[in-house]
Design a protein with these regions (language model features):
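C-terminal output helix
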Residues: 106-115
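Charged docking surfaces used in two-component/phosphorelay signaling
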Residues: 15-23
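Short hydrophobic/Thr-rich beta-strand motif most characteristic of the beta2 strand and flanking loop
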Residues: 25-32, 40, 102
């Protein structure tokens, strides 16, 4: 079973996305911010991470940079799911190591299609 780490400061979004992904057959872990995600990654080895960009504390771009420094996560796909639509943010996220980008609100079928491409 493929494991996905969801990182977002909205617990409502985390729970709804978790339900969608679990129904599709993924194991899901959640974190409400960058620091919590890094703590989980000390022991968790997900196949993919989905993160928001705008979170209190550590933002998503900083989180991606930190995750990519971890030897066990260097090659893990990272999908950004955010309300941000600025091209500069996309460029910054890709430079940090993001693999893909989805703008909220995301349709479940769109998310699942992207996941199948990133972690077949």
């Amino acid at each position: 079973m493929k494991t996905v780490l969801l990182v977002d400061d909205s617990t409502t979004l985390l729970m709804s996305m978790k339900a969608i992904l679990e129904k599709a057959g993924y194991a899901v872990q959640t974190a409400t911010g960058g620091d919590a995600a890094l703590k989980l990654l000390a022991t968790l080895k997900p196949n993919l991470m989905i993160t928001d960009l705008n979170m209190p504390g550590m933002d998503g771009i900083t989180l991606i940079k930190e995750v990519k420094k971890l030897p066990t996560c260097r090659f893990m796909p990272v999908l950004v799911m955010t309300t941000e639509s600025q091209q500069q943010k996309r460029t910054d996220a890709r430079a940090a190591g993001a693999t893909g980008w989805l703008v909220k609100p995301v349709k479940p079928e769109e998310l699942l299609e992207v996941l199948k491409k990133l972690i077949p």
